Amino acid sequence: MLFPFALMKIAFVAPLPNSGTNRYYYRDIWQGMRAFQAEAAEFNIEILDFGFSGPLSSLPKHLEEVYQNHCDEISGLITLAVEDPAFTYFIDQFSKRSIPSVFIVSDLPQAKRLCCVRAQDLMAGSLAAELISGFTGNRGKALVVSGDIMVSTHYMNATGFEQYFAKSRSRMEVIKIYNRKEPERLYIELLELLRSDPEISAIYSCTATNTPPVCKAVQDAGRAGTVKVIGSDLFQESREMLLAGVLQAIIYKKPFQLGYLGCKALFNFLVKNEFPKSDSIFIEPIVLLKSNLPFYECDIAADNAYESI
């Protein structure tokens, strides 16, 4: 006779996908989480939605709220990592209560987590640099537009990009720009740079969030096609820009897999008592060009995908 599984609750703390620019990336992560939740329904798993709006710097505050109000009812935690003492403190507090944490998207190895599921960000940056090297013949200046320097996935992308050119001893000048989800400010800054500096020959947007304002600035500066642009992740706007020739390629980090595999790793540990094979589970990025885009277009989520899951 089969006995029903006791209800097990997992806290999922991540930026909401239905507010502003978060929809470009986090929507797929939430879809991955919902897909795994549906698959694991027979095991009586409930994933508690603690989505939040606002900057990632507010994440420790949301973890504090979960810890204070829900610590007695949850068996595990899935969240992102930020380099903030308050974040590390609350992850340690969860660990002391025997609540394992799985990180997705970004890592902080010194924190007490079970594992991290993330894109191979150094590889993503290196792939973008190699593409730009080929597109430009290593001539001119390359801008690498990243996100929040407190988030490992952002600065590791930029690092991988820089390291490629350093190892190849290229004369190409690399200029880093960090933008904390302020697309209009980024657009204005890039537009001024593109209009004033004819030596800019390439741009790599490390994040999905920054890809649309990068494309708009290149278009409005009248330099689409001449400035080679590599975008990040696949969504309706990036697809259109690739087909229009504003983007020459997309580095696709498969965010759906981050949400899905993060839940699976924690589920296997809690339900099956299986430890992850590694404390770092990497998703290998894919280079999308016009020629292979049709094979991945089915991955593009509808605008109402989060609400319909």
Can you say where each PLM-predicted feature lies in the sequence?
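Short, solvent-exposed amphipathic alpha-helices that sit
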Residues: 24-41, 61, 124-128, 152-172, ...
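Hydrophobic alpha-helical
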Residues: 66-70, 75-99, 161, 175-239
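Short beta-strand->loop
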Residues: 15-16, 118, 143-152, 178-179
